Amino acid sequence: MQKHLERRPHFLFIFLMLLVYLPVFFCLAVLRARWFGWAMAALSFWMLFWMHGRPFWHGWRILVFSISAYLVVFVGMYIARPDWEVSLPSQIGSGIVRTFTSLPKNEQDFGKSILMDSDWTPPDGYACKVVNLSHAKLELLYPTDGNSVHALLQLHGGAFIAGLNDLYRKFAVRYSQLYDNCLVATLDYRLAPQYAYPAQQTDAMDAWLYLRDSLSYPADRIVVAGDSAGGNLALSLGLRLRDAGEALPAGFVCMSPWADLSNSGASHVYNATVDPSFGIAAADFHGQPVGVDSDYTAGLDATDPYLSPSFGDYHDFPPMLLQAGSIEVLLSDSEMVYENARDYGVDCTLTVYKGMFHVFQGAMDLLPESASAWEEVGRFLAKLAK
């Protein structure tokens, strides 16, 4: 009897097992892994639990058994992932996004949750200062030992309700590194619903004019970049400049632009139940188009090209790089812009990343697909800098 009791797993061992395996089971859940992935993880867990306290459970064997068990878990997760053409980290990331966005929230609470006081400081070799525009603020990030003749205007995403946060400050550093160590101006524009359309576009134009007129950067030395709602602002800014007969930027970089606020594109239907950011449950889908849950267009014509740049025409536009994920409802927003731009002979590239979600580039180098997307941005900007 005493011998049997000595072999019972110690409380600390059980605690450590749970500490290690709970994240594993969480990843399997958000991954929506096939059944055999769960089976291999459960087998691994049971084998370690069974071996603990056995005569052979001591010394170096503990390390060997533990590593072997974790390898079984990893292999099981790897082969049980739903899509073999998409990396395992990216599919886990997509599942985490789906879990987070499924939590109940409202627009104002969501916006406030992102508007946190920043403790971000520029990395070595960079400095940052804030400029007050008429109605908004502009953060200028610049190398302390550089003298680049280029600049980049960054317009952040967030459905027009979430303000500037540290992710975009990290984006700014990356953009500067990729575009000739340039100055990057990130606009902190006014937010809805307190400030309705076109306040955000007015702020974007003010930021553009500040770079061009106050800092004296020629238009053809400025790139405009934006993601999601920021991609909308970037494209709308270009349309307004072109229609006013003004010089256009050197190029545009748009990541998952929210460019069709009417939700009329095909992907707003066929990706309605698979998009982890804006999709809905299959039980709630009855063929209706699905998009960003927003009242931004209330009382407005959602097909106005300035409001929904997917409906604009892009004659005379400079080179454009569009990136989107294959499973996002906003995919067709980019496709509509791309098709129109190509019809007018614009040097426009659209890259659709398999299995990727909305603004997956926010993962920076953590996901293989995100790293590849940034490499593509780097190649595009390097061409413009020549």
What are these regions (language model features)?
Residues 4-52, 63-108, 114-386:
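Alpha/beta-hydrolase superfamily serine-hydrolase fold, recognizing
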Residues 56-60:
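Amphipathic, cytosolic membrane-interfacial segments at TM-TM junctions
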